Amino acid sequence: MGAGKTTLYDAHLKEAFPDLIPPISHQREAALREQRSFAVEDLVVDTELLESARDAGYATKVVFISTEDPNLNVGRILIRMAHGGQSLPLSTIPESYEESLRSLPEARKHADDVLVYDNTPDGKGHRLVARFISGELVRVTHSSPDWLKRLFGRELCGRSKRGNEPRGQSKSYVKSH
């Protein structure tokens, strides 16, 4: 809620994955049965969906987005609501924020590729800060946000294998071969 998932999807993923499926299990199951590539936007990473997709022959990718502080998300949602956007219970945002962060370490175990973005407002927009391939950290920015450091700690220090500052594009998506 308020991390910038829809903005990133609209700007970078919509063309490749026009089928954005809501978190409704029967729609996800139908897409898997039909072997359609699709994207899913949710607050937490659905590891069961990732496993089902892998079992069905999909290559799975998670695009995870967070901010430094859930109060930033609250502010974004208030602005969206003031402009006629969806009304949300603001009191649930801090808990949802923490739940989302807790899902990231599990996501790396269940997805083929995990791209991690920070969207803390600093004039940079969505900033790729880490990447995991098959559970292994392969890229990390030299200026990791504190929320990422809290999750992965020492693993981030000196573990980047493919470069210091990754470049590129809270969505998880699966794509069929």
Mark where each language-model region is:
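Conserved substrate/cofactor phosphate-moiety recognition/catalytic segment
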Residues: 3-40
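Conserved GTP-binding G-domain of TRAFAC-class P-loop NTPases and closely related GTPase folds
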Residues: 79-173
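Acidic, metal-coordinating catalytic cores used for nucleic-acid/nucleotide bond scission
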Residues: 39-49, 67
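Conserved phosphate-donor/acceptor-positioning beta-strand/loop module used by diverse small-molecule
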Residues: 56-77
